[in-house]
Design a protein with these regions (language model features):
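FMN-binding flavodoxin-like domain, especially the glycine-rich phosphate-binding loop
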Residues: 2-116
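Short loop or secondary-structure boundary microenvironments that flank
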Residues: 27-28, 133, 161
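A mid-sequence, solvent-exposed acidic-amphipathic segment
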Residues: 103-136, 141
Length: 196
């Protein structure tokens, strides 16, 4: 949130033979000051920073916000197509992305708020399953942090959660809840739309 959750993955990834780097980020409302952190990664890897593109997609952070219903999610994805196509064109042509918004709010949310938010709110201890869990292991497979294991055929969360919500939003039986905060909320996961 306001700094992408897989920061360590990106900063540790080797980019062999690359000279330039573009960052394409999706979000439910805004990416905050993520461009600053992307620029830092580019500098750290001795790459020419070509900018950060923001693609608005359906919200999936149901520990705090509401995800849209399926039809509304489809509209949001459809509305993102022009921004996606512009992004593709800029990369194909080797052009930098236009500068992203960088105001006081963005710097505040990505700066002092972000570490406090992660320290006190981004915890896995509120995740739980109900009796509809079928022990399929989808949550284990979908976790980018390898933070979930099946114990006695039920998911157990470790301490490396980034709140990506893949476990809760991809659960085929909607058996996972984040305390009471997610109860009754629609789950969002990407649904491929037919492109023109």
């Amino acid at each position: 949130m306001w700094v992408y959750p897989l920061w360590s993955v990106y900063s540790e990834t080797e980019l062999l033979s690359a000279k330039r780097i573009w960052f394409v980020m999706n979000c439910g409302s805004e990416i905050g000051n993520a461009a600053k952190y992307n620029r830092n990664i580019a500098e750290q890897k001795h790459l020419c920073y070509m900018g950060t593109s923001q693609i608005l997609m359906p919200e999936n952070y149901i520990a705090m916000f509401d995800a849209p219903e399926a039809e509304e999610a489809r509209k949001i994805v459809k509305n993102a197509e022009p921004a996606i196509m512009d992004t593709v064109v800029w990369i194909k042509e080797g052009q930098p992305f236009p500068a992203t918004r960088n105001n006081l709010y963005d710097r505040f949310m990505s700066g002092p708020v972000n570490p406090i938010f992660y320290r006190f709110f981004v915890k896995a201890n509120a995740f739980q399953t109900d009796d509809t869990c079928i022990s399929c292991g989808q949550c284990v497979e979908n976790c980018p942090m390898n933070n979930i294991t099946l114990e006695s055929d039920k998911p157990t969360w470790g301490k490396q959660c980034t709140h990506c919500m893949a476990c809760i939003c991809y659960c085929p039986t909607e058996a996972i809840e984040y305390g009471k905060k997610s109860m009754g909320k629609p789950r969002y996961h990407f649904e491929q739309l037919k492109m023109k």
